[in-house]
Curated annotation (Swiss-Prot):
This is Large ribosomal subunit protein uL10. It is found in: Nucleus; Cytoplasm. Belongs to the universal ribosomal protein uL10 family. It comes from Rattus norvegicus. GO terms for molecular function: large ribosomal subunit rRNA binding; peptide binding; structural constituent of ribosome. P0 forms a pentameric complex by interaction with dimers of P1 and P2. Identified in a IGF2BP1-dependent mRNP granule complex containing untranslated mRNAs. Interacts with APEX1. Interacts with FMR1. Pfam families: Ribosomal_60s, Ribosomal_L10, RL10P_insert. Residues 294-317 are annotated as: Disordered.
Length: 317
Protein backbone atom coordinates (compact mmCIF):
# COMPACT_ATOMS: atom_id res chain seq x y z
CA UNK A 1 0.00 0.00 0.00
CA UNK A 2 2.73 2.56 0.80
CA UNK A 3 4.36 1.81 -2.57
CA UNK A 4 1.07 2.56 -4.32
CA UNK A 5 0.76 5.82 -2.37
CA UNK A 6 4.28 6.77 -3.37
CA UNK A 7 3.53 5.99 -7.01
CA UNK A 8 0.34 8.05 -6.85
CA UNK A 9 2.23 10.94 -5.28
CA UNK A 10 4.85 10.82 -8.06
CA UNK A 11 2.16 10.71 -10.73
CA UNK A 12 0.41 13.72 -9.22
CA UNK A 13 3.72 15.59 -8.97
CA UNK A 14 4.46 14.97 -12.66
CA UNK A 15 0.98 16.16 -13.60
CA UNK A 16 1.37 19.26 -11.44
CA UNK A 17 4.73 20.36 -12.85
CA UNK A 18 3.57 19.76 -16.44
CA UNK A 19 0.38 21.75 -15.81
CA UNK A 20 2.38 24.62 -14.30
CA UNK A 21 4.81 24.64 -17.25
CA UNK A 22 1.83 24.79 -19.63
CA UNK A 23 -0.14 27.40 -17.68
CA UNK A 24 2.68 29.81 -16.84
CA UNK A 25 4.83 31.30 -19.63
CA UNK A 26 7.47 32.57 -17.19
CA UNK A 27 9.36 31.11 -14.26
CA UNK A 28 12.48 31.47 -12.14
CA UNK A 29 14.87 28.66 -11.31
CA UNK A 30 15.72 29.45 -7.69
CA UNK A 31 18.32 28.15 -5.26
CA UNK A 32 16.93 27.24 -1.85
CA UNK A 33 20.08 26.69 0.23
CA UNK A 34 19.64 27.49 3.94
CA UNK A 35 15.90 28.18 3.50
CA UNK A 36 13.90 26.52 6.26
CA UNK A 37 10.32 25.26 6.09
CA UNK A 38 8.97 28.22 8.08
CA UNK A 39 10.63 30.75 5.77
CA UNK A 40 9.42 28.81 2.71
CA UNK A 41 5.88 28.99 4.04
CA UNK A 42 6.19 32.77 4.46
CA UNK A 43 7.48 33.08 0.89
CA UNK A 44 4.54 31.06 -0.47
CA UNK A 45 2.08 33.23 1.47
CA UNK A 46 3.61 36.49 0.23
CA UNK A 47 3.49 35.28 -3.39
CA UNK A 48 -0.06 33.93 -3.18
CA UNK A 49 -2.14 35.07 -6.15
CA UNK A 50 0.92 36.23 -8.08
CA UNK A 51 3.28 33.26 -8.25
CA UNK A 52 3.52 29.54 -7.43
CA UNK A 53 6.56 27.95 -5.78
CA UNK A 54 7.33 24.32 -6.64
CA UNK A 55 10.17 22.36 -5.05
CA UNK A 56 11.12 18.74 -5.59
CA UNK A 57 13.87 16.27 -6.35
CA UNK A 58 15.97 17.17 -9.37
CA UNK A 59 15.57 13.70 -10.89
CA UNK A 60 11.79 13.98 -10.76
CA UNK A 61 11.78 17.48 -12.23
CA UNK A 62 14.08 16.44 -15.07
CA UNK A 63 12.00 13.32 -15.77
CA UNK A 64 8.77 15.33 -15.90
CA UNK A 65 10.30 17.92 -18.25
CA UNK A 66 11.83 15.30 -20.56
CA UNK A 67 8.47 13.58 -20.81
CA UNK A 68 6.90 16.87 -21.94
CA UNK A 69 9.50 17.93 -24.55
CA UNK A 70 7.35 16.67 -27.44
CA UNK A 71 4.69 19.22 -26.60
CA UNK A 72 7.10 22.02 -25.65
CA UNK A 73 10.68 21.56 -26.97
CA UNK A 74 11.79 24.92 -25.47
CA UNK A 75 11.67 23.33 -21.99
CA UNK A 76 14.90 21.48 -22.80
CA UNK A 77 16.75 24.73 -22.01
CA UNK A 78 15.79 24.25 -18.35
CA UNK A 79 17.48 20.87 -17.93
CA UNK A 80 21.16 21.99 -17.62
CA UNK A 81 20.20 24.38 -14.81
CA UNK A 82 18.39 21.86 -12.61
CA UNK A 83 21.25 21.01 -10.28
CA UNK A 84 21.78 21.52 -6.58
CA UNK A 85 19.02 22.49 -4.19
CA UNK A 86 16.72 24.27 -6.67
CA UNK A 87 13.05 24.79 -7.38
CA UNK A 88 10.71 26.79 -9.62
CA UNK A 89 8.73 30.00 -9.12
CA UNK A 90 6.03 30.20 -11.81
CA UNK A 91 4.30 33.49 -12.59
CA UNK A 92 2.32 35.49 -15.14
CA UNK A 93 3.17 38.81 -13.48
CA UNK A 94 6.02 41.21 -14.12
CA UNK A 95 9.28 39.37 -13.45
CA UNK A 96 10.94 42.35 -11.79
CA UNK A 97 8.06 42.65 -9.32
CA UNK A 98 8.28 38.97 -8.36
CA UNK A 99 12.07 39.24 -8.07
CA UNK A 100 11.66 42.16 -5.65
CA UNK A 101 9.15 40.17 -3.58
CA UNK A 102 11.61 37.29 -3.28
CA UNK A 103 14.35 39.69 -2.18
CA UNK A 104 12.01 41.21 0.41
CA UNK A 105 11.52 37.76 1.96
CA UNK A 106 15.19 37.24 2.76
CA UNK A 107 15.87 36.88 6.48
CA UNK A 108 19.08 37.81 8.35
CA UNK A 109 21.13 34.89 9.62
CA UNK A 110 24.06 34.50 11.97
CA UNK A 111 27.39 33.20 10.69
CA UNK A 112 27.93 29.50 11.38
CA UNK A 113 31.32 27.81 11.45
CA UNK A 114 31.90 25.82 8.28
CA UNK A 115 29.30 27.69 6.20
CA UNK A 116 30.28 29.22 2.85
CA UNK A 117 29.99 33.00 2.95
CA UNK A 118 27.52 34.25 0.29
CA UNK A 119 28.84 37.80 0.68
CA UNK A 120 31.73 39.81 2.06
CA UNK A 121 31.64 40.49 5.81
CA UNK A 122 33.18 43.68 7.23
CA UNK A 123 33.27 44.48 10.93
CA UNK A 124 32.91 48.26 11.39
CA UNK A 125 35.01 50.34 13.75
CA UNK A 126 33.13 50.46 17.05
CA UNK A 127 33.26 50.12 20.79
CA UNK A 128 32.45 46.44 21.29
CA UNK A 129 31.41 46.70 24.93
CA UNK A 130 33.56 43.62 25.65
CA UNK A 131 36.00 43.52 28.53
CA UNK A 132 39.81 43.64 28.20
CA UNK A 133 40.05 39.87 28.78
CA UNK A 134 38.92 39.35 25.14
CA UNK A 135 41.86 41.32 23.68
CA UNK A 136 43.83 38.20 22.73
CA UNK A 137 40.82 36.95 20.78
CA UNK A 138 40.88 40.06 18.56
CA UNK A 139 44.66 39.88 18.20
CA UNK A 140 44.39 36.30 16.92
CA UNK A 141 42.12 37.56 14.12
CA UNK A 142 44.48 40.44 13.29
CA UNK A 143 42.06 43.14 14.44
CA UNK A 144 43.64 46.33 15.80
CA UNK A 145 42.02 47.43 19.07
CA UNK A 146 42.53 49.62 22.11
CA UNK A 147 41.05 49.72 25.57
CA UNK A 148 38.66 52.63 25.98
CA UNK A 149 36.93 53.16 29.35
CA UNK A 150 37.43 49.55 30.30
CA UNK A 151 36.08 48.07 27.03
CA UNK A 152 37.62 46.98 23.74
CA UNK A 153 37.31 49.41 20.84
CA UNK A 154 37.94 48.38 17.20
CA UNK A 155 39.95 51.20 15.62
CA UNK A 156 39.10 50.70 11.93
CA UNK A 157 36.83 48.70 9.65
CA UNK A 158 38.07 45.12 9.17
CA UNK A 159 37.25 42.79 6.28
CA UNK A 160 36.68 39.59 8.22
CA UNK A 161 35.37 37.19 5.55
CA UNK A 162 35.49 37.26 1.75
CA UNK A 163 32.74 36.01 -0.55
CA UNK A 164 33.04 32.25 -1.03
CA UNK A 165 35.29 31.72 2.00
CA UNK A 166 34.46 29.11 4.60
CA UNK A 167 33.49 30.72 7.89
CA UNK A 168 35.94 29.77 10.63
CA UNK A 169 35.01 29.07 14.23
CA UNK A 170 36.79 32.23 15.45
CA UNK A 171 35.04 34.46 12.90
CA UNK A 172 31.64 32.97 13.75
CA UNK A 173 32.24 33.41 17.49
CA UNK A 174 33.33 37.05 17.06
CA UNK A 175 30.30 37.95 14.94
CA UNK A 176 27.97 36.32 17.45
CA UNK A 177 29.65 38.20 20.33
CA UNK A 178 29.11 41.47 18.45
CA UNK A 179 25.48 40.53 17.64
CA UNK A 180 26.18 40.82 13.91
CA UNK A 181 24.07 38.69 11.54
CA UNK A 182 26.02 39.22 8.32
CA UNK A 183 24.17 36.88 6.00
CA UNK A 184 20.64 36.83 4.64
CA UNK A 185 19.02 33.72 3.25
CA UNK A 186 16.12 33.28 0.86
CA UNK A 187 15.27 31.98 -2.59
CA UNK A 188 18.09 33.06 -4.93
CA UNK A 189 17.20 33.48 -8.61
CA UNK A 190 19.68 31.52 -10.72
CA UNK A 191 18.03 31.63 -14.14
CA UNK A 192 15.01 33.27 -15.77
CA UNK A 193 12.79 31.36 -18.23
CA UNK A 194 10.56 33.65 -20.28
CA UNK A 195 8.42 32.33 -23.16
CA UNK A 196 11.04 29.85 -24.33
CA UNK A 197 14.10 32.03 -23.67
CA UNK A 198 16.43 31.51 -20.73
CA UNK A 199 18.79 34.15 -19.41
CA UNK A 200 20.67 35.43 -16.35
CA UNK A 201 18.73 37.37 -13.67
CA UNK A 202 21.06 40.36 -14.17
CA UNK A 203 19.11 41.09 -17.36
CA UNK A 204 16.16 42.19 -15.20
CA UNK A 205 18.24 45.15 -14.01
CA UNK A 206 18.58 46.54 -17.55
CA UNK A 207 16.24 49.53 -17.94
CA UNK A 208 14.90 51.17 -21.10
CA UNK A 209 17.19 54.13 -20.43
CA UNK A 210 20.22 51.82 -20.27
CA UNK A 211 19.21 50.16 -23.55
CA UNK A 212 18.75 53.57 -25.17
CA UNK A 213 22.19 54.72 -23.98
CA UNK A 214 23.91 51.55 -25.19
CA UNK A 215 22.14 51.76 -28.54
CA UNK A 216 23.34 55.33 -29.08
CA UNK A 217 26.88 54.32 -28.11
CA UNK A 218 26.72 51.53 -30.69
CA UNK A 219 25.48 53.91 -33.39
CA UNK A 220 28.30 56.34 -32.61
CA UNK A 221 30.88 53.55 -32.76
CA UNK A 222 29.51 52.28 -36.10
CA UNK A 223 29.50 55.80 -37.54
CA UNK A 224 33.08 56.41 -36.37
CA UNK A 225 34.42 53.17 -37.88
CA UNK A 226 32.54 53.69 -41.16
CA UNK A 227 33.88 57.24 -41.47
CA UNK A 228 37.43 56.02 -40.92
CA UNK A 229 37.26 53.26 -43.54
CA UNK A 230 35.04 55.18 -45.98
CA UNK A 231 32.17 52.69 -45.88
CA UNK A 232 28.77 54.42 -46.11
CA UNK A 233 26.00 53.42 -43.70
CA UNK A 234 22.84 55.08 -42.41
CA UNK A 235 24.76 56.15 -39.30
CA UNK A 236 27.75 57.59 -41.15
CA UNK A 237 26.19 59.19 -44.28
CA UNK A 238 25.03 62.44 -42.53
CA UNK A 239 28.56 62.97 -41.18
CA UNK A 240 30.07 62.14 -44.58
CA UNK A 241 27.83 64.72 -46.29
CA UNK A 242 28.74 67.43 -43.75
CA UNK A 243 32.46 66.64 -43.99
CA UNK A 244 32.24 66.65 -47.79
CA UNK A 245 30.47 70.02 -47.77
CA UNK A 246 33.17 71.47 -45.51
CA UNK A 247 35.89 70.28 -47.90
CA UNK A 248 34.12 71.71 -50.96
CA UNK A 249 33.58 75.01 -49.13
CA UNK A 250 37.26 75.17 -48.15
CA UNK A 251 38.26 74.43 -51.75
CA UNK A 252 35.92 77.15 -53.03
CA UNK A 253 37.40 79.71 -50.64
CA UNK A 254 40.94 78.92 -51.76
CA UNK A 255 40.14 78.93 -55.51
CA UNK A 256 38.03 80.83 -58.03
CA UNK A 257 35.43 78.07 -58.08
CA UNK A 258 32.20 79.21 -56.48
CA UNK A 259 28.60 78.17 -55.85
CA UNK A 260 25.65 79.95 -54.17
CA UNK A 261 26.28 78.68 -50.64
CA UNK A 262 29.96 79.65 -50.86
CA UNK A 263 29.38 83.22 -52.07
CA UNK A 264 28.23 84.50 -48.66
CA UNK A 265 31.28 82.96 -46.96
CA UNK A 266 33.59 84.56 -49.56
CA UNK A 267 31.86 87.92 -49.10
CA UNK A 268 32.30 87.72 -45.34
CA UNK A 269 35.99 86.84 -45.64
CA UNK A 270 36.50 89.68 -48.14
CA UNK A 271 34.88 92.36 -45.92
CA UNK A 272 34.01 91.27 -42.34
CA UNK A 273 33.31 94.91 -41.37
CA UNK A 274 30.25 95.00 -43.61
CA UNK A 275 28.69 92.18 -41.62
CA UNK A 276 29.73 93.84 -38.35
CA UNK A 277 27.99 97.08 -39.41
CA UNK A 278 24.89 95.22 -40.53
CA UNK A 279 24.43 93.59 -37.14
CA UNK A 280 23.64 96.80 -35.15
CA UNK A 281 21.29 97.98 -37.92
CA UNK A 282 19.37 94.74 -37.75
CA UNK A 283 19.21 95.00 -33.96
CA UNK A 284 17.97 98.60 -34.17
CA UNK A 285 15.33 97.64 -36.73
CA UNK A 286 14.04 94.97 -34.39
CA UNK A 287 14.11 97.27 -31.37
CA UNK A 288 12.35 100.23 -33.09
CA UNK A 289 8.79 98.80 -33.06
CA UNK A 290 9.20 97.89 -29.40
CA UNK A 291 10.45 101.40 -28.56
CA UNK A 292 7.54 102.96 -30.46
CA UNK A 293 5.06 100.78 -28.64
CA UNK A 294 6.38 101.84 -25.22
CA UNK A 295 5.44 105.58 -25.43
CA UNK A 296 2.04 104.64 -26.79
CA UNK A 297 1.43 102.55 -23.68
CA UNK A 298 2.60 105.42 -21.44
CA UNK A 299 0.24 107.86 -23.22
CA UNK A 300 -2.65 105.48 -22.92
CA UNK A 301 -1.93 105.11 -19.21
CA UNK A 302 -1.81 108.88 -18.66
CA UNK A 303 -5.13 109.34 -20.48
CA UNK A 304 -6.66 106.64 -18.36
CA UNK A 305 -5.46 108.32 -15.15
CA UNK A 306 -6.83 111.71 -16.28
CA UNK A 307 -10.24 110.27 -17.07
CA UNK A 308 -10.27 108.58 -13.65
CA UNK A 309 -9.50 111.90 -11.97
CA UNK A 310 -12.29 113.65 -13.89
CA UNK A 311 -14.69 110.96 -12.87
CA UNK A 312 -13.70 111.38 -9.23
CA UNK A 313 -14.16 115.20 -9.21
CA UNK A 314 -17.50 114.88 -10.96
CA UNK A 315 -18.77 112.59 -8.24
CA UNK A 316 -17.92 114.95 -5.37
CA UNK A 317 -18.94 118.31 -6.96
Amino acid sequence: MPREDRATWKSNYFLKIIQLLDDYPKCFIVGADNVGSKQMQQIRMSLRGKAVVLMGKNTMMRKAIRGHLENNPALEKLLPHIRGNVGFVFTKEDLTEIRDMLLANKVPAAARAGAIAPCEVTVPAQNTGLGPEKTSFFQALGITTKISRGTIEILSDVQLIKTGDKVGASEATLLNMLNISPFSFGLIIQQVFDNGSIYSPEVLDITEQALHTRFLEGVRNVASVCLQIGYPTVASVPHSIINGYKRVLALSVETDYTFPLAEKVKAFLADPSAFAAAAPVAAATTAAPAAAAAPAKVEAKEESEESDEDMGFGLFD
